[in-house]
Swiss-Prot record:
Organism: Bacillus cereus (strain ATCC 14579 / DSM 31 / CCUG 7414 / JCM 2152 / NBRC 15305 / NCIMB 9373 / NCTC 2599 / NRRL B-3711)
Name the record gives this protein: Chaperone protein ClpB
UniProt subunit comment: Homohexamer. The oligomerization is ATP-dependent.
Location relative to the cell: Cytoplasm
PANTHER family: ATP-DEPENDENT CLP PROTEASE, HEAT SHOCK PROTEIN 104
């Protein structure tokens, strides 16, 4: 036989038959080897044809294997290694297969021709086929359903058989099987799609919208309407096939193979005479799909059929990809009619989630409160700005349910703690058992008593946990059963099987509903007691997930955080000394935000800190970050002195398209996208170019900036602090006796500020805060703070440092300069105190656990070790 006259799959089967013969030590390849080789290919055509005939594949395989085992095997020195003979029976089989191919007017011998030849085989194989009721007529019937009217004209025809089933999925069948979630709302879009599909020509809608707004769901909604027969007469018996472009392209190694597969799909649709609607999700993938040198891409192959109305196609793609790929090909674009899928409102999202609630409850085995659904819609809309409803709200509910589900399946915390304590005591018991002294024996008795008590508690808790788990699983199983019965009822009513429908509606379903109600009431009754497991998803869980995703504290305040916020002003005052007004205004803004009464469309607070250098402007920003986030690293600090040139603006929001660094994004926008809840410090703003402030206008007023890539960056959860030295000379000169700023000095500073910044910029800032120069009393407090920081650095060596009052006075006099603020003081302490301590430490005079006193002698600081 000429192998070139066979298809690739037939050649592969003959090679596999040879391998089987070698592995069984047979000297010749027979028909039974070929039969088993065909059956062992899982997704092969032979298996598909036998499945269509309802043949038991495993029984057929076992029969073939037992026939192979009967064949004589040759091993040992007499065996001719590497020599295989083809039996005359196999040669005759292949000749018969060739004749079958001629009868069917095929150019190549394919797997189906070999199967038809097998049906005429005599002997053992004939007996096996007769036992399993395999006849030539049955084979031909099944072959026609798989192959249709296609002829074998290439060496890989199997790829074109049942093309739709292989490269797509039937959405209508999936709806009938209950695999698709219900689609709530979207009626206007579904009606528009139905209107376009009912046209004579150009009846191809394309759904365009942002990712996550529910484009695919609209098509699933149409499939559900087709199942319910809630569509016009022309669409009643239609089915929707979702085409899988990746499956179509995958494995197409040779030129023309991809086109052949796609053509087979299109031919099947054409033969259906409008019964099949083709749904292509991610429609832009057809542009350029399968395009190689001289080949035609999928888009161009679809155009003629789309224009003639032979192909009913529904597309779905995002706005950006539609513009980028489809609009570039006007001939393809004009064949589609756009249907814009808008993002649903928060109210619509709540309705969608209420419709999906039952499916989530059945899948996860939890109860979802209605408050959780409302919270998911509202919080996702407010805090997750880079994604779209309803997708982000559905994800929130799903993750919250999954959190509760994993808690149900894992050991409760209370039981886990008791179990660990038991393990710890058992280890201690084993160690004490080896000791003989009286004290150890007494301790052992006490320990054994505690251990037996704990084991009793643990066994009680474990039994309670198992019972609660069992109850939850029972409710979940009943819900699943009820869901199945409701699906069966829909199917029975659709098929007018009235007996079955009546039995379900009036018999089985009410019985299960009653049982479910009793189980839920029992669970509600048990809830009054102290339960180990939670099975409710409430708004707290949703808020917790939002906080985890974004880092923004949305969850209800726990007691510790409540106290911390009420003490925020005091905490800030401990580190920022002498600036009561600034501390008070900043802490008030944070309190308003966490209480939830701030304007949701503006930042938490925006402040300009004015004052001389070294009075605590930057320190307050750092302290605020430390207090709110337990880390100064959470502060986004931008030194505005780096933005002196006009073109430096692009570094804040990203370089424009075509410039180097376009892909990298801006320093400010990227930092806030990563950490939406943070303190943004714009240091030394008067040094920046005036153009920079135009960028900040939207940030201060609407709490958002659009970066160079067109993404909206949300600043609504940031505290924006800008520092400046403008007018510091007036502040230094204009102090009252009590340390407050004179009114005329305040006016002079504000006048200078208005001269430097535009009114529209200053008008958008919440507060302009003047930092007053530090007085001598405040400087003493700063000395204490510096010494405290030094002690913190020496804490691991248990060395304490103390400055006498005289030493403090001396440091204040020698180190403080009103013009430069507290920074020279820090440098002085570093030079005069820290250096002396370092010398003594290296010399070994100061050892660990020492108490060091710094005093003044002969107008000089000295160190005494105690």
């Amino acid at each position: 036989m000429d192998l070139n006259q066979m298809t690739t799959k037939t050649q592969e089967a003959i090679m596999s038959a040879q391998s089987l013969a070698v592995s069984h030590h047979h000297q010749e390849v027979d028909t039974v080897h070929l039969l088993l080789a065909l059956l062992e290919e899982q997704d092969g055509l032979a298996v598909r044809i036998f499945q269509k005939m309802n043949v038991d594949i495993e029984a057929l395989k076992q029969g073939a294997e037992s026939l192979i085992k009967k064949k004589p095997s040759v091993t040992g020195s007499g065996a001719e290694v590497g020599k295989l003979y083809v039996t005359s029976a196999l040669q005759q089989l292949l000749v018969r297969a060739g004749k079958e191919a001629e009868k069917l007017q095929d150019d190549y011998i394919s797997v189906e021709h070999v199967l038809l030849a097998f049906s005429e085989e005599k002997g053992d194989i004939n007996q096996l086929f007769t036992r399993l009721h395999i006849t030539k007529d049955n084979l031909l019937q099944s072959l026609m359903t798989v192959r249709g009217n296609q002829r074998v004209t290439s060496q890989n025809p199997e790829a074109t058989y049942e093309a739709l089933e292989k490269y797509g999925r039937d959405l209508v069948a999936e709806v009938r099987a209950g695999k698709i979630d219900p689609v709530i709302g979207r009626d206007s879009e579904i009606r528009r799609v139905i209107r376009i599909l009912s046209r004579k020509t150009k009846n191809n809608p394309v759904l365009i919208g942002e990712p996550g707004v529910g484009k695919t769901a609209i098509v699933e909604g149409l499939a559900q309407r087709i199942v319910k027969k809630d569509v016009p007469e022309g669409l009643k018996d239609r089915t929707i096939f979702a085409l899988d472009m990746s499956a179509l392209v995958a494995g197409a190694k040779f030129r023309g193979e991809f086109e052949e597969r796609l053509q087979a799909v299109l031919n099947e649709i054409k033969k259906s005479e409008g019964r099949i609607l083709l749904f292509i999700d991610e429609l832009h993938t057809i542009v350029g799909a399968g395009k190689t040198e001289g080949a035609m891409d999928a888009g161009n192959m679809l155009k003629p059929m789309l224009a003639r109305g032979e192909l009913h196609c529904i597309g779905a793609t995002t706005l950006d990809e539609y513009r980028k790929y489809i609009e570039k090909d006007p001939a393809l674009e004009r064949r589609f009619q756009q249907v814009l899928a808008e993002e649903p409102t928060v109210e619509d999202t709540i309705s969608i989630l209420r419709g999906l609630k039952e499916r989530f409850e059945i899948y996860h085995g939890v109860n979802i409160h209605d408050r959780a659904i409302v919270a998911a819609s509202v919080l996702s809309d407010r805090y997750i700005s880079d994604r779209f409803l309803p997708d982000k709200a559905i994800d929130l509910v799903d993750e919250a349910c999954a959190t509760i589900r994993t808690e149900i399946d894992s050991m409760p915390t209370e039981l886990d703690e008791v179990t660990r304590r038991i393990m710890q005591l058992e280890i201690e018991e084993a160690a004490l058992g080896k000791e003989t002294d009286r004290g150890s024996q007494e301790r052992l008795k006490t320990l054994q008593r505690e251990l037996s008590d704990l084991k009793e508690v643990a066994s009680g808790m474990r039994a309670k946990w198992e019972k609660e788990k069992e109850d939850i699983h029972k409710v979940r199983d009943l819900r699943e059963h009820l869901e199945r019965l409701r699906r069966e009822l829909e199917e029975a009513e659709g098929n007018y099987d009235l007996n079955k429908a009546a039995e379900l509606r009036h018999g089985k379903i009410p019985a299960i509903e009653k049982e479910l109600k009793e189980a839920e009431e029992m669970g509600a009754h048990n809830k009054q007691e102290n339960r180990l497991l939670r099975e409710e998803v409430s708004e707290e869980e949703i808020a917790d997930i939002v906080s985890r995703w974004t880092g923004i504290p949305v969850a209800k305040l726990v007691e510790g955080e409540r106290e911390k916020l009420l003490r925020l002003e005091q905490i800030l005052s401990e580190r920022v000394i002498g600036q009561e007004e600034a501390v008070s205004l900043v802490s008030d803004a944070v309190l308003r935000a966490r209480a939830g009464i701030k304007d949701p469309n503006r930042p938490i607070g925006s402040f300009i800190f004015l004052g001389p250098t070294g009075v605590g402007k930057t320190e307050l920003a750092k302290t605020l970050a430390q207090s709110l986030f337990d880390s100064e690293e959470q502060m986004i600090r931008i030194d505005m002195s780096e933005y002196m040139e006009k073109h430096a603006v692009s570094r804040l929001i990203g370089a424009p398209p075509g410039y180097v660094g376009y892909e990298e994004g801006g320093q400010l926008t990227e930092a806030v996208r990563r950490k939406p809840y943070s303190v943004v410090l714009l240091d030394e703003i008067e040094k920046a170019h005036p153009e920079v402030f135009n960028i900040l206008l939207q940030m201060l007023d609407d709490g958002r900036i659009t970066d160079s890539q067109g993404r909206t960056v949300d600043f609504k959860n940031t505290v924006i602090i800008m520092t400046s030295n403008i007018g510091s000379a007036h502040l230094l000169d204009g102090l009252e006796e009590d340390g407050s700023i004179k009114e005329e000095s305040r006016d002079l500073v504000m006048g200078q500020l208005r001269g430097h910044f535009r009114p529209e910029f200053l008008n958008r800032v919440d507060e302009i805060i003047l930092f007053k120069p530090l007085t001598t009393n405040e400087i003493k407090g700063i000395v204490d703070k510096i010494v405290k920081e030094l002690q913190g650095r020496l804490a691991d060596r248990h060395i304490t440092v103390e400055l006498t009052d005289a030493a403090k006075e001396f440091v204040v006099e020698a180190g403080f300069d009103p013009m430069y603020g507290a920074r020279p003081l820090k440098r002085y302490v570093q030079r005069q105190v820290e250096t002396k301590l370092a010398r003594e430490l290296i010399a070994g005079t100061i050892t660990d656990n020492s108490h060091v006193v710094v005093d003044v002698e002969n107008n000089e600081l000295v160190v005494h070790v105690k």
